Every structure is written in C-alpha cells, then in structure tokens.
Amino acid sequence: MTGTAGPLEGRVAVVTGAARGLGAAIARELSDRGATVALIGREESTLAEVRDTLPGPARCWEADVTDDARMAEVADEVREQLGHASAVVANAGLAEGGPFAESDPATWRRVIEVNLVGSAITARAFVPHLRTTRGYYLQIASLASIGAAPMMSAYCASKAGVESFGHALRAEFAHEHVGVGIGYLNWTDTDMIRDADQHPVLRELRAHMPRPARKVYPAETVARHMVRAVERRRASVYVPAWLRATQLVRAAMPPVVTALSKHELPKLERKAAFEPTGLLGAGGRADAEGRRGADG
C-alpha cells in the first residue's frame, strides 16, 4: 500500500439503475475506490439496502430517469448535499423480448424511453456538474449496439441509440474537457438475464450463439472494468475485451444474423410458441409497478 489517493478518492459519482444488478455492483466498486456515491433508482428500499452495504459515504434518490423535472431536482439535491458530480454512469435500463408484431406497444415504448431517453435526461440533468468538475460521463451500451438480434427489437434499437448518443456527446463536450465513454457489454449475470433464460425462445437464441458470445460474466467483473474506465476517462470499454473486434466487422453482421435467423427461427418456433415476455427482471417489474402507482 502506497497511500496514494486514487482518481476517485473524495469525488462524487452518480449511478442510475443502482438498486440491483450491474448498477449496484458499479456503485460498490466506486465506493471501494473512495468515491462518494449518489444512487438513483425506482426502488427506494432496495436502494437503501445497497447504500447500507457500501464502505464509503453514499446517499440514494428514488427517481424515474424519464422524468425531466425529477431528475433535475435530484441533480440539484446531489450538488447541495454531496457536491458537484465528477462522474456519472448512465446504467438504468430495461429489456423485453419476443416477436415485434405481437409486442405490447406501451412496453416496447417504455424500453426505448428508459434506455435512450432516460440516458439523455440523465446527461441533461448532470452536464452542469460535469462542466464544473471537468468530469466524465459513462454511457452503458451493449453488444446489441453493434449487432441487432431478432426478438429483442426494442432493446437493440435503444442500445444502438445510446451508442450514437454517446458519440455525439463526446464530440460536443470535448472542448469543455468533459469526457464521455461508452461501455459495451455482453451477457452480464443479473436478474434480467436470468429472467430472459426462463423464456424458451430467448434461451434458445442465446444457446445458438457462438460459445464465446453466449458466456455470462459476473456483474462484479463487469463493474470493475467499467469503473477502471471511469478512472482512466476511456472513450470506450469492452467486456469481454474481444467485443472490440466486432467493431471491425459490424457492417457484415446484419446479413449474417438475417441468414441464421431465417434458418433457425422456424425450428425454434416449432419447439415453443413465440410470445412477448413483458419487461424482464425484478427491475422491469418494479418499473411497471411504479408506473401503475403513478397512474393510480
């Protein structure tokens, strides 16, 4: 131990979607490295449980990332209570699967709203912080940003969108010394992925991927790489590292996926009917319950 403070020591870091899964793991990793963490999510009690496990100072805010006014309010409260954020991780996300033609329009739209619009609202709320601190914004994306897959149209569309959004922000804020990075992930061991595996069509689609592409990575491992990218202000981070190579062949991926889908989907449909999954995982169910409560 040298006693030398790391780049996150004493800094304020914001994580959305922090109540569980990758968001909670990123919050723990940030806290382990000396950051004061602001946790944002839909589940107040679950956020508090995460907060209470962190080794360093942290506070939590219940918020829907698609609510402009609430996110602006949270950003003001973070500044007042903790100080300006030096790092923001836009991690909040939802997923649903199944055939597009039979998908529930409101559920499909909600995935786009949370994953893409929610990321934009998060950035808008915290850009004043990052301008002040010359901070860093990490946009969580996916292999789905690079290559789309059938039966995951909303998720793939949203992740392609957040990748482009991240590139646009990086170019726009570079002269202000605000860093923007994009985190490309493959399968991460969260309740969302475990829930997806309960649906035959999604489980079979993943099983038909090449072995390296279907491997599931622990959330803690992914979080460690994401936080290292925050410390180093990386323009991009890939977990696993081989995902970077897919950027070189992304133009060839759509026809390959189309050919494979044309061959495999009829066989899968004979095994089990294709049905919409609804929002996946405990986070998806919490989001649906939160919206029902707001409407009721």
What are these regions (language model features)?
Residues 175-241:
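SDR active-site lid
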Residues 33-49:
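Conserved glycine-rich Rossmann-like NAD(P)H-binding loop of the short-chain dehydrogenase/reductase
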Residues 142:
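Residue(s) in the substrate-gating loop at a strand-loop-helix junction
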Residues 123, 158:
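Active-site helix of classical SDR
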Residues 99-100, 104-109:
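Substrate-binding pocket helix/loop in short-chain dehydrogenase/reductase
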